[in-house]
Amino acid sequence: VARFKSLIEAGLLKPEAIEALSAFEPRPDFDRSLSYNALKLFTNGNYALRDQNFRLAETPSMAAWRVATAVARELERAKLYYAYITQLKIVPASPFWFNAWTRKEMFASCFTLEVEDCLSSITHPGRYCIYDALAYSGIIQQLGGGVGYDFSLLRPEGDVVRGSVGVASGPVSFMRLFDANVDVIKQGGKRRGAQMGTLHVWHPDIRKFMKAKTGELKDAPLQNFNIAVFVDDTFMEKALGVDGDSKYKLINPRVFYDKTGKKAVEFVDVHKETQVPKEAVWGELDARQLFGEIAHGAWDSG
């Protein structure tokens, strides 16, 4: 209990935690029962709190009690949860251990963030732009959470940028920003960050996206990303040659929105659910060939 009080006095835990933490009942049997590897993970993985001098400040059973009381809040329920944890019937996710009773309590492990086709809400009020997502991502990563993004709304490489009379660099270039963001944050020194990036198969930059982690590039950029391709029924039917035609149309999401007032990602199968404006069609590709490339890319980068 004295250790908990010292952590509160140091500002590492919330003052209101004192009542719940003061009811701590040590479980030395639990502390001693953990294997060497488990204790190594507990300490080196920063599941235990550390003081201002970065020294370990709690035992495994102390950490379990801290988590149990932060989650349950009501004492009897906390005792039951504590019993389950110390019996290893329940093992809470990492953010519980990192953040329970701290000033930035955040228990969720996974988040998804929208990335709209604009740089900042400063110039585009009411929209959730690239650098807005980047800022929120940094906060989530700092607290130990992982983040997923769909980059399908970003205009393709080479498309016009009317505000600057320039051309767009495409989704993959912006993904490098998010990748570097994780390296800088390092999840608050707790663990390596985790990110998922996705792109719809109809996006004109789909080949560049799926090859960003394959071949000679697989050990270079986007080391903090897993990537995945969203496919729809139309694409799979083309890939399987259902109607004898394997050609699949690519869509510029910016032009699609300009012409329809809707986001292409709102549709499960945009080709079947709406009439794609001809101006939004940015070429076509062989679905059967691309499906093979996607499968090979998954193997090559895995």
State where each predicted segment sits.
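Extended catalytic cores of very large enzyme megasubunits
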Residues: 1-301
